[in-house]
């Protein structure tokens, strides 16, 4: 069975060294963390780590059990479609001269994206949505303009059924 991408939401105590201990656990087990975001929660003394890792089910289960043994870990939830919300943010820089600029702006408006920077020969676009929406925007833009660069970041967070504080 090939590894699949898994997203873990890990509620931890907001204390120095917790991130290092969690990252070391993944490293010792030979897992590469593909994406990591850490931020404060609504509870002042807690932080939430969102960790994306590729793994098969059995090793992921083992690492989850090991995470639960860490003293500063409060709760771990694997985020899936049913218990989370996901979005992708794309920053796309396109070559757009006076002749193609109106076409680009039309496409941007159609996808409810925003032009966030303008220069004489290029536009920078900010788009958010699911992966399909971002891919569709890129397909619409590519025939008429040259995409100079793009940076895409995907994130997932607990939805209403994925939030709680019990271990």
Curated annotation (Swiss-Prot):
Pfam families: ACT_AHAS_ss (PF22629), ALS_ss_C (PF10369). One of its GO terms (biological process) is L-valine biosynthetic process. CDD domains: ACT_AHAS. GO terms for molecular function: acetolactate synthase activity; acetolactate synthase regulator activity. One of its GO terms (cellular component) is cytosol. Residues 7-81 form the ACT domain. The keyword Amino-acid biosynthesis applies. PROSITE patterns: ACT. Its EC number is 2.2.1.6. Keywords: Amino-acid biosynthesis, Branched-chain amino acid biosynthesis, Transferase. Pathway: Amino-acid biosynthesis; L-isoleucine biosynthesis; L-isoleucine from 2-oxobutanoate: step 1/4; Amino-acid biosynthesis; L-valine biosynthesis; L-valine from pyruvate: step 1/4. It catalyses: 2 pyruvate + H(+) = (2S)-2-acetolactate + CO2. InterPro entries: Acetalactate_synth_ssu, Acetolactate_synth/TF_NikR_C, Acetolactate_synth_ssu_C, ACT-like_dom_sf, ACT_dom, AHAS_ACT, AHAS_small-like_ACT. Belongs to the acetolactate synthase small subunit family. NCBIfam families: acolac_sm (TIGR00119), PRK11895.1 (NF008864). Dimer of large and small chains. This is Acetolactate synthase small subunit. It comes from Mycobacterium avium. The gene is ilvH.
